[in-house]
Amino acid sequence: MRQLCLSSALLFLLVILVDSTPLNIHHIQDEGVETSHRRGPEKRSVIDVVTSIIDGVATGTKIVKNGAGLLTGLAEIITKAIKGQVMISRIQFDNHTQEELPTLNIEYSTLSEENKGVETSHRKGPEKRSVIDVVTSIIDGVATGTKIVTKGASILTGLAEIINKAIRGQVMISRIQFNNHTLEEFPKLNIEYSTLSEDNTGVETSRRRGPEKRSVIDVVTSIIDGVATGTKIVKKGTSILTGLAEIINKAIKGQVMISGIQFNNHTLEEYQTLKIEYSALNEENKAASKPALCLEPKVTGGCNAVMTRYFYNAQNGLCEQFVYDGCEGNGNNFEKLEDCMKTCSQEAGSL
């Protein structure tokens, strides 16, 4: 059950990202996920990959018979993709093994074949609605600016439950009655939806200047924009998105201060630890999102020439001068300081 909740939460956040914040994504420098093709390595953005999955599989997924498991399977595939364990849309992640490829390809094809739309039932007769359209309408109408006070932390939990019911066709939302919904459930669910709507007044936060309110989506978007966009998944980098998910969960529960926002049920004792945790993710993300050559060690060579060159020191984030003797070496070798900074660290200074 916990795994299902996490999968649902992941899909929930991804839909927010894809459908609610496209303009915030494109202007950010996006180094991407390093992948492996027959033509050689390439980089793909985490967001691009996830978007392609959602566009190709989730949009209009038909939820009938065993179809309720489709989005669960999709969430699992996305999780595998984030961990670099799956090939999707001809993209093979760098730590993916050939042995897994056929199975995952079949799994993806099965999901694609069942992508026929959500069958719903209206007074005017049956119609089909996209899962994303339905979920987006819920998020737009309820989640944006959900107020997290007293028992308000359960609002997003309740929202997730409603989304799960909608996916399984057990709830009527925004005048859409799903095909296996019963009239007996209608009034109760309508009240549940109204209760959530009434609490939609923003996240109450506490700053030095006094309390303020911030939208849940604004907070989550700022985290995703700052950490997840284009995160390169190498070595320990896979833990970045896991840590990000944990931070988002803490934020939803009001247990974390992020981007200058302190939630109202956050304690001062937790503040410093969580701030360090967020900073560590940002630093790890900076290193992980650089071209591979920037992470290569300094190599002076083995000949007798004397040339002034520059390399990027991943330990301190600076472009540093060194003496190169003219042979051997690697890609982390620049003739000009400007080239080093432009390639590896636009914010770096020099020594």
From Swiss-Prot:
InterPro entries: Kunitz_BPTI, Kunitz_BPTI_sf, Prtase_inh_Kunz-CS, TFPI/VKTCI-like. CDD domains: Kunitz_TKDP-like (cd22609). Keywords: Disulfide bond, Glycoprotein, Repeat, Secreted, Signal. It comes from the Eukaryota. One of its GO terms (molecular function) is serine-type endopeptidase inhibitor activity. One of its GO terms (cellular component) is extracellular space. Sequence repeats lie at residues 32-116, 117-201, 202-286. The record marks 304-305 as: Reactive bond homolog. It is found in: Secreted. Disulfide bonds join 294-344, 303-327, 319-340. Its main location: secreted. Residues 32-286 are annotated as: 3 X 84 AA approximate tandem repeats. Residues 1-20 form the signal peptide. Glycans are attached at residue 265. The keyword Transferase does not apply. May play a role in mediating maternal-conceptus interactions in the immediate preimplantation period. Does not seem to have proteinase inhibitory activity. This is Trophoblast Kunitz domain protein 1.
